[in-house]
């Protein structure tokens, strides 16, 4: 995941025609964005932020408060771009980016957030949902999408973790991340690699859920076609 996110950061920056140093900085945010995960599993034996710590802030603290960044890049701790990397990592999994950040820093945050989301789509396609969400096949195939989650497709935004109540809410919630992609190239990559179609092809044994996914497919396809023309 780390290497793929770094690669996607580079692809996005090149599409934005940023310079080589900016591209390297964006690549570095991808390489370091989940550094908190390693210490999280070591200390708490879980990747679940709700049961341990926010891995994004934890990783940023390890790198920039405890000095771990110095093992990766010399003299980067107090550098202008060091601050940008710290903020990008700190905000990469937040529901919304810190509003106090300047526009230039927000750009790097968005590059990393887009790259992370696109590879999360890949993980959802390549890995059994039962393993990702720690649910049984029966729960996944028989549960319904909660009203709050369905509302996100009407309102075109991501789903708060607290709104996900059922097993299938997690599937729909990850699909809804599409609404948060900032750069057209990010959506183009996700579409061309087949991630969106494969996620939306989820099949349920519950008739109500089947109809809900028909609605999800219609609304997401409409969004992709009209809001983010490829």
Q: Residue ranges of each PLM-predicted region?
A:
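His-Asp-centered metal-binding catalytic motifs of divalent-metal-dependent phosphohydrolases/nucleases
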Residues: 23-48, 59, 63, 81, ...
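Acidic/histidine metal-binding catalytic segments
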Residues: 17-28, 69-90, 105-111
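An active-site-proximal "capping" alpha-helix that borders the catalytic cofactor pocket
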Residues: 4-12, 53-68
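Catalytic-loop motifs flanking and including active-site residues across diverse enzymes
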Residues: 1, 24-27, 55, 59, ...
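Short, solvent-exposed secondary-structure capping/transition elements
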Residues: 41, 71-73, 188
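Short coil/turn segments at secondary-structure boundaries
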Residues: 44-54, 73-77
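Divalent metal-dependent phosphate-bond-processing catalytic cores, especially two-metal-ion Mg2+/Mn2+ enzymes
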Residues: 3, 7, 11-23, 32, ...
């Amino acid at each position: 995941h780390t290497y793929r996110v770094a690669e996607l950061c580079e692809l996005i920056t090149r599409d934005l025609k940023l310079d080589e140093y900016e591209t390297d900085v964006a690549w570095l945010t991808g390489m370091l964005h989940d550094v908190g995960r390693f210490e999280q599993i070591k200390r708490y034996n879980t990747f679940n932020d709700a049961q341990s710590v926010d891995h994004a802030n934890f990783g940023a603290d390890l790198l920039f408060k405890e000095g771990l960044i110095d093992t990766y890049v010399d003299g980067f701790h107090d550098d202008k771009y060091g601050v940008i990397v710290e903020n990008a990592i700190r905000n990469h999994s937040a529901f919304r980016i810190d509003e106090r950040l300047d526009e230039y820093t927000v750009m790097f945050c968005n590059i990393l957030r887009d790259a992370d989301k696109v590879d999360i789509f890949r993980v959802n396609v390549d890995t059994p949902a039962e393993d990702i969400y720690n649910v049984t096949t029966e729960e996944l195939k028989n549960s319904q999408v909660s009203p709050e989650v369905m509302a996100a497709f009407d309102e075109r935004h991501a789903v708060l973790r607290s709104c996900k109540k059922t097993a299938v809410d997690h599937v729909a919630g990850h699909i809804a991340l599409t609404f948060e992609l900032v750069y057209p190239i990010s959506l183009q990559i996700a579409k061309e690699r087949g991630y969106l179609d494969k996620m939306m092809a989820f099949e349920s044994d519950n008739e109500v859920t089947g109809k809900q996914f028909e609605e999800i497919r219609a609304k997401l396809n409409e969004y992709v076609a009209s809001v983010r023309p490829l």
